[in-house]
């Protein structure tokens, strides 16, 4: 795979620190992709960013509770057309709700509802969590996934995003069933990966470079 994407310098990217997420590894990955990166814990710091990354590891209900102070700032940024990139739990938080909150006894935790849909648990006999490398099958064009069709990325998750509109699915992966690995809204500026690009070697670096280039072009 060609990983020589430029990652245009000058794109200002903020990584949202809401208490859950691989902040350092995500930041290092973005720096390798030539971004100017800051980790921010203040919602007001999102205002001047070219792009926003919402990372996340853990339970949906906890994520939404911790990220509560950022809800309005994230929604405003998305409405303004600025790029918002959710990673793993961060991607799931872009949706409307999750079965996980119900299973954890947290009730109906509300997501950001930037991509209508619900996160659901794997069914059948597959081992959960889905952990390890798996293949990406791109289903529609989006700047984030240029050059990664058929490549492998690293996953760790028990739930996955199920958008109401199948047109919001950008790439799929097979783990006993086909599930969305990358999703995006209609406008294309809000998107997420179920896998961890910062842990996905050359494939992940290509995706992060695609993201930085997209932010620089806006």
Swiss-Prot record:
Record's keyword annotation contains Amino-acid biosynthesis: yes
Pfam families named among the record's database cross-references: GATase
Key words of the record: Amino-acid biosynthesis, Cytoplasm, Glutamine amidotransferase, Histidine biosynthesis, Hydrolase, Lyase
Metabolic or biological pathway, per its Swiss-Prot or TrEMBL entry: Amino-acid biosynthesis; L-histidine biosynthesis; L-histidine from 5-phospho-alpha-D-ribose 1-diphosphate: step 5/9
Alphabetized InterPro entries for the sequence: Class_I_gatase-like, GATASE, Imidazole-glycPsynth_HisH
GO molecular function, one term: glutaminase activity
Domain Glutamine amidotransferase type-1, chain residue ranges per copy: 12-218
Active site: 88 (nucleophile), 196, 198
Reaction catalysed by this enzyme: 5-[(5-phospho-1-deoxy-D-ribulos-1-ylimino)methylamino]-1-(5-phospho-beta-D-ribosyl)imidazole-4-carboxamide + L-glutamine = D-erythro-1-(imidazol-4-yl)glycerol 3-phosphate + 5-amino-1-(5-phospho-beta-D-ribosyl)imidazole-4-carboxamide + L-glutamate + H(+); L-glutamine + H2O = L-glutamate + NH4(+)
Signal peptide: none
One GO location term (cellular component): cytoplasm
Location(s) in or outside the cell: Cytoplasm
Known EC number: 4.3.2.10, 3.5.1.2
PROSITE patterns per UniProt: GATASE_TYPE_1
GO biological process: L-histidine biosynthetic process
Quaternary organization: Heterodimer of HisH and HisF.
Role summary: IGPS catalyzes the conversion of PRFAR and glutamine to IGP, AICAR and glutamate. The HisH subunit catalyzes the hydrolysis of glutamine to glutamate and ammonia as part of the synthesis of IGP and AICAR. The resulting ammonia molecule is channeled to the active site of HisF.
HAMAP family for this protein: HisH (MF_00278)
Protein name per the record: Imidazole glycerol phosphate synthase subunit HisH
Source organism (scientific name): Halobacterium salinarum (strain ATCC 700922 / JCM 11081 / NRC-1)
Lineage of producing organism: Archaea, Methanobacteriati, Methanobacteriota, Stenosarchaea group, Halobacteria
